[in-house]
Curated annotation (Swiss-Prot):
One of its GO terms (biological process) is tRNA 5'-leader removal. Its EC number is 3.1.26.5. InterPro entries: Ribosomal_Su5_D2-typ_SF (IPR020568), Ribsml_uS5_D2-typ_fold_subgr (IPR014721), RNase_P (IPR000100), RNase_P_CS (IPR020539). It catalyses: Endonucleolytic cleavage of RNA, removing 5'-extranucleotides from tRNA precursor. Keywords: Endonuclease, Hydrolase, Nuclease, RNA-binding, tRNA processing. RNaseP catalyzes the removal of the 5'-leader sequence from pre-tRNA to produce the mature 5'-terminus. It can also cleave other RNA substrates such as 4.5S RNA. The protein component plays an auxiliary but essential role in vivo by binding to the 5'-leader sequence and broadening the substrate specificity of the ribozyme. GO terms for cellular component: ribonuclease P complex. This is Ribonuclease P protein component. The keyword tRNA processing applies. Pfam families: Ribonuclease_P. The lineage of its organism: Bacteria, Pseudomonadati, Pseudomonadota, Gammaproteobacteria, Oceanospirillales. Belongs to the RnpA family.
């Protein structure tokens, strides 16, 4: 039962944690109403950060509903996502999604992110060759 909890060590806690994901993104999954950004870690720990702004939903109840659903879905998909820092970024239109629909989209997005994270990253090599 304890593997489904959401303690401090599986959360991105400060601005530096979030900034490292934004600066060194290794995988992205865009799912229309939300965006998942991931950065590979040196260890097997998986951490999640949530960004749900007032632009996505003016009411705190709606923002908290979105965060609750994302945390719940993340808890069930932690194992295939090991070794990643992940930022969930809510986009405009997410508040119109029903809970079941959002949960299904999150399930697909976690799977896509796990597949992308397993692939070796060649983007860095391409970016470096373009700069020369």
């Amino acid at each position: 039962m304890t593997e489904y909890c959401f303690p401090r060590h599986v959360r991105l806690l400060n601005a530096g944690d979030y900034q490292s994901v934004f600066n060194d993104t290794s995988s992205k999954v865009f799912a229309g109403e939300f965006l998942l950004l991931a950065r590979k870690r040196d260890d097997d720990q998986t951490r999640l950060g949530l960004i749900v702004s007032k632009k996505t939903d003016k009411r705190a109840v709606g923002r908290n509903r979105i965060k609750r659903l994302v945390r719940d879905s993340f808890r069930h998909h932690k194992i295939p996502l090991s070794g990643l820092d992940i930022v969930f970024l809510a986009r405009h239109g997410i508040k119109e999604l029903e809970n079941a629909d959002l949960h299904n989209r999150l399930d697909k997005a976690w799977d896509q992110l796990a597949k992308k994270a397993l692939k070796p990253t060649q983007n860095k090599k391409r970016d470096q060759s373009r700069q020369k």
